[in-house]
Amino acid sequence: MNVVQGNIEAKNAKVAIVISRFNSFLVESLLEGALDTLKRFGQVSDDNITVVRVPGAVELPLAARRVAASGKFDGIIALGAVIRGGTPHFDFVAGECNKGLAQVALEFDLPVAFGVLTTDTIEQAIERSGTKAGNKGGEAALSLLEMVNVLQELEQQLL
């Protein structure tokens, strides 16, 4: 039986982090978690990390698509925070962001890690950006590192 799985070290990986400025007090913590994970666990150097800032979560897929189209990166981490309010706006923003990022991954055969918080309350978002429930930015970085390795392993085995 052949089992393909990745590890989390990716010293030579070139990673783009596309980050929303909206809810910046939360999203900056996600960025810190992602950067710490990439450097500490993945051994990714600062020179191989590019941070792209966009206004909000709706803009993440377009920026991710442009990054993917450049062909210069091994993976993308998308970071943002969408918190439910009193209108259906949350559903549209969260859904379109998720769908758009998934489309980029499939179109460009490139891992796109989803580190966008989609919570009902600000308290839930705070918990997920580095307090009680961990740091979802760091978790997205771990996922990306593993997927970069899985895809490289698949490419080697399938050629």
Swiss-Prot record:
A Gene Ontology BP annotation from the UniProt entry: riboflavin biosynthetic process
Residues reported to bind (2S)-2-hydroxy-3-oxobutyl phosphate: G86, T87, R128
Pfam families, per database record: DMRL_synthase
Chain's role: Catalyzes the formation of 6,7-dimethyl-8-ribityllumazine by condensation of 5-amino-6-(D-ribitylamino)uracil with 3,4-dihydroxy-2-butanone 4-phosphate. This is the penultimate step in the biosynthesis of riboflavin.
Entry protein name: 6,7-dimethyl-8-ribityllumazine synthase
Protein encoded by which gene: ribH
Gene Ontology CC terms: cytosol; riboflavin synthase complex
Oligomeric form and interacting partners: Forms an icosahedral capsid composed of 60 subunits, arranged as a dodecamer of pentamers.
Organism name: Shewanella baltica (strain OS155 / ATCC BAA-1091)
InterPro entries: LS (IPR034964), LS/RS (IPR002180), LS/RS_sf (IPR036467)
Record keywords, A-Z: Riboflavin biosynthesis, Transferase
Keyword Transferase: yes
UniProt record similarity statement: Belongs to the DMRL synthase family.
